[in-house]
Curated annotation (Swiss-Prot):
A Pfam short name: DUF167
GO CC terms in record: cytoplasm
Taxonomic placement: Bacteria, Pseudomonadati, Aquificota, Aquificia, Aquificales
Family: Belongs to the UPF0235 family.
Classification via PANTHER family: UPF0235 PROTEIN C15ORF40
HAMAP family the record matches: UPF0235 (MF_00634)
Official protein name in the record: UPF0235 protein HY04AAS1_1378
Length: 73
């Protein structure tokens, strides 16, 4: 499964919401420095989707706020 994710780094609170276009908007506390935001994104997604972090891969957009995230079965 591939998800379109819009990430908001440096947020005050962590949240996940589904947008009208079926993508997810995820607010995270980490800054977009040295991959910290991507690490927190994977952690938040794994908790939200109840899957292991090892089953989540950022397929595209590692240095962008808009990402394609692949979830393995």
């Amino acid at each position: 499964m591939i998800l379109r994710v819009k990430v908001k780094p440096n947020a005050k609170t962590v949240s996940v919401e589904q947008l009208e276009d079926k993508s997810l908007k995820i607010s995270i506390k980490s800054p977009p420095v040295n991959g910290k935001a991507n690490e927190e994104l994977i952690k938040v997604l794994s908790e939200f989707l109840k899957v292991s972090k090892s089953k989540i891969n950022i397929k595209a957009g590692k240095s962008s706020r808009e990402k394609l995230v692949e979830i393995y079965d």
